[in-house]
From Swiss-Prot:
Protein name (record): Histone H1
Residues modified as Phosphoserine: 174
Encoding gene per record: HHO1
Start and end residues of each stretch annotated as Disordered: 1-44, 101-171
InterPro entries on file: H1/H5, Histone_H1/H5_H15, WH-like_DNA-bd_sf, WH_DNA-bd_sf
GO cellular component: a single term: nucleus
Similarity annotation: Belongs to the histone H1/H5 family.
Role, per record: Could act as an H1-type linker histone. Has been shown to bind DNA.
Basic and acidic residues bias locations: 119-131
Taxonomy of the source species: Eukaryota, Fungi, Dikarya, Ascomycota, Saccharomycotina
Extent of Low complexity compositional bias: 1-11, 132-154
GO molecular function: chromatin DNA binding; DNA binding; double-stranded DNA binding; molecular adaptor activity; nucleic acid binding; nucleosomal DNA binding; phosphate ion binding; structural constituent of chromatin
Superkingdom of the source species: Eukaryota
Compartments, record wording: Nucleus; Chromosome
Biased composition (Basic residues): 155-164
Length: 258
């Protein structure tokens, strides 16, 4: 029988067992990296960008209140939220965002904040200019000018006829050219056998007789009364009982062919 070999456990002197200190160091380094990255991220963003991020994250249809937005920033960016002048910068960012058109406050400055809907720029359609119609127009104008030139050559000289005096006389005596004074003086002999008439009766007669020839009816009374006043001043009409009395025709001064 061969003797049993004695087995002895040998331990490696050079290698040391791993301790928990190395793990703690690695985790602390990772945490420091995360915090520094978050600090850099928060410092690189403006308050306006943080508010926009909060509005998109909260997704409230009617907008988010200021306290809700402040809470979001303080929870996600505690370094920014812990600043002493946080409220001042926060409110200024909202005010400038509203002025710039980035935010909306439908219920006023104390109301909720919403992201403004950006209007899509309207693209102006350029009018298509077709050169063909212009050429056609120029050709038509050229033919028209040629036709005019031909007509001017062939057309005989026009004989200017003198106007007949009867036409001018008719135009002068037409009722459309009568003044209020002339209408009143023509109406006076027809009323009460020329013995005089009241202002109301005379006015009615003038309206009925010259109704189609009166250009203005809105200021008829004013023009009628001013015409009577001028006739009285000129001596063509007489008012024996004063301005409110009857009106008579001064036959000595006025000679009318009825």
């Amino acid at each position: 029988m061969a003797p049993k070999k004695s087995t002895t456990k040998t331990t490696s002197k050079g290698k040391k067992p791993a301790t928990s200190k190395g793990k703690e160091k690695s985790t602390s380094k990772a945490a420091i990296k995360k915090t520094t990255a978050k600090k850099e991220e928060a410092s690189s963003k403006s308050y306006r960008e943080l508010i926009i991020e909060g509005l998109t994250a909260l997704k409230e249809r009617k907008g988010s209140s200021r306290p809700a937005l402040k809470k979001f920033i303080k929870e996600n960016y505690p370094i920014v939220g812990s600043a002493s002048n946080f409220d001042l910068y926060f409110n200024n960012a909202i005010k400038k965002g509203v002025e710039a058109g980035d935010f909306e406050q439908p219920k006023g400055p104390a109301g909720a904040v919403k992201l403004a809907k950006k209007k899509s720029p309207e693209v102006k359609k350029e009018k298509e200019v077709s050169p063909k119609p212009k050429q056609a127009a120029t050709s038509v104008s050229a033919t028209a000018s040629k036709a005019k030139a031909a007509s001017t050559k062939l057309a005989p000289k026009k004989v200017v006829k003198k106007k007949s005096p009867t036409v001018t006389a008719k135009k002068a005596s037409s009722p459309s050219s009568l003044t209020y004074k002339e209408m009143i003086l023509k109406s006076m002999p027809q009323l009460n056998d020329g013995k005089g008439s009241s202002r109301i009766v005379l006015k009615k007669y003038v309206k009925d007789t010259f109704s189609s020839k009166l250009k203005t009816s809105s200021n008829f009374d004013y023009l009628f009364n001013s015409a009577i006043k001028k006739c009285v001043e000129n001596g063509e009409l007489v008012q024996p009982k004063g301005p409110s009395g009857i009106i008579k025709l001064n036959k000595k001064k006025v000679k009318l062919s009825t």
